[in-house]
Amino acid sequence: MNKENASKLWKIIQEAGDYLVGQLPDHPNHPKGRNPYAHVAICVKSKFNASYKDIPDELYNEVIKYIEFLKENPS
């Protein structure tokens, strides 16, 4: 992904993390609470098999749609 798109995507990931603070369900592996920023980044990496910086530019809009899905469906 080009630098400009990667930067925009990182900002969107951070905003999604802000939105998800306190919304993720409890998990026994995270007794002090879950990190919503890491959750979004890990979900993106898992779905697209690459770090957000390494996803092709052609998938930029698809990544944004997926992040919106994560916000609507905290898990």
Question: For the regions a protein language model found, what residue spans apply to each?
Answer:
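Positively charged, phosphate-engaging catalytic surfaces used for nucleic-acid and nucleotide handling
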Residues: M1-S75
